[in-house]
């Protein structure tokens, strides 16, 4: 009952422009629109993002129109339609193009809104509970929501060395050698696995740059939304 497609950007985002990587490395959204949404579509769990969607009027009227309880009304509306048993289809072909965010502050502001909205949906209309969704659909939606909570553990590990130097506080109480023996194999394995799975859609090194910069800004609003989603 719904059809979604890709909205492409023909200008570099702030990271691509400042680091000189435009058209040289995959854009931040390439993984989501290239693999994740395609995978969601396999389980009838793809959701529309922004303007690139066609929705039948009757199903939309049945759920009371576009969801306005959260700031990510597109994903929330998709969830409600899936709960009612309606199906979706995803076209992995760019149907529209526009400008990417032109400044770092605008880019961060956009990601803050996405992060806050997805956590709001998790709290107000949790896909793990309630009727209407298949098990695979629940997992697809939860995966999209939990992604934006990654800023919290990332901040903890980024500030752990500083906490030790200033306050002699241990995040993990163990000798450095033991930490290396347990952590390094995991980090190497995770990096190689991600690179293998993501392939041309995302490069691990540049992904870490995006995620590290954004973590400082999306962690506070997602934490607040978890506690008070309204």
Q: At which residue positions do the language-model features occur?
A:
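Active-site donor/metal-binding and catalytic loop motifs
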Residues: 92-106
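General secondary-structure propensity
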Residues: 68, 101, 196-199
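Catalytic donor-sugar/metal-binding loop of nucleotide-sugar-dependent glycosyltransferases
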Residues: 69, 78-96, 184
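Long helical/loop segments within the catalytic core of UDP-sugar-dependent glycosyltransferases
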Residues: 3, 7-71, 83, 104-145
